[in-house]
Amino acid sequence: RITEMIPERNEQGQTLWSKMNDAGSDRVMVSPLAVTWWNRNGPITNTVHYPKIYKTYFERVERLKHGTFGPVHFRNQVKIRRRVDINPGHADLSAKEAQDVIMEVVFPNEVGARILTSESQLTITK
């Protein structure tokens, strides 16, 4: 198929494919230049399906064009960073400290609300 559609040499006389058999298979050897030639001179098909394939990309571009970015909040970075500075290397955080860091990262707004004991939890739910 390739040999029917792509010439053996391009305009500069560089070989695009040769009739020498590829070792171990009965196919012709094709140069990477053939791809370039095809991209430049190959048949042009309709581009209707591109948006379908790159749907997410196109949608994202559209969103970015019309997008507004709300206020971005960075909270509690300092606290966590300081904690990391105090424990350099692989000194493991104590279970409690690890819990604190996780809580700070996962629930940034709840910082300072200590993990409630089951009793106080009960009274609240009551």
Swiss-Prot record:
Plays an essential role in transcription initiation and cap-stealing mechanism, in which cellular capped pre-mRNAs are used to generate primers for viral transcription. Binds the cap of the target pre-RNA which is subsequently cleaved after 10-13 nucleotides by PA. Plays a role in the initiation of the viral genome replication and modulates the activity of the ribonucleoprotein (RNP) complex. In addition, participates in the inhibition of type I interferon induction through interaction with the host mitochondrial antiviral signaling protein MAVS. Influenza RNA polymerase is composed of three subunits: PB1, PB2 and PA. Interacts (via N-terminus) with PB1 (via C-terminus). Interacts with nucleoprotein NP (via N-terminus). Interacts (via N-terminus) with host MAVS (via N-terminus); this interaction inhibits host innate immune response. Belongs to the influenza viruses PB2 family. It comes from Influenza A virus (strain A/Camel/Mongolia/1982 H1N1). One of its GO terms (cellular component) is host cell nucleus. The gene is PB2. Pfam families: Flu_PB2_2nd, Flu_PB2_3rd. This is Polymerase basic protein 2. It is found in: Virion; Host nucleus; Host mitochondrion. GO terms for biological process: 7-methylguanosine mRNA capping; cap snatching; symbiont-mediated suppression of host cytoplasmic pattern recognition receptor signaling pathway via inhibition of MAVS activity; symbiont-mediated suppression of host gene expression; symbiont-mediated suppression of host mRNA transcription via inhibition of RNA polymerase II activity. Its main location: virion. Keywords: Cap snatching, Eukaryotic host gene expression shutoff by virus, Eukaryotic host transcription shutoff by virus, Host gene expression shutoff by virus, Host mitochondrion, Host nucleus, Host-virus interaction, Inhibition of host innate immune response by virus, Inhibition of host MAVS by virus, Inhibition of host RLR pathway by virus, Inhibition of host RNA polymerase II by virus, mRNA capping, mRNA processing, Viral immunoevasion, Viral transcription, Virion.
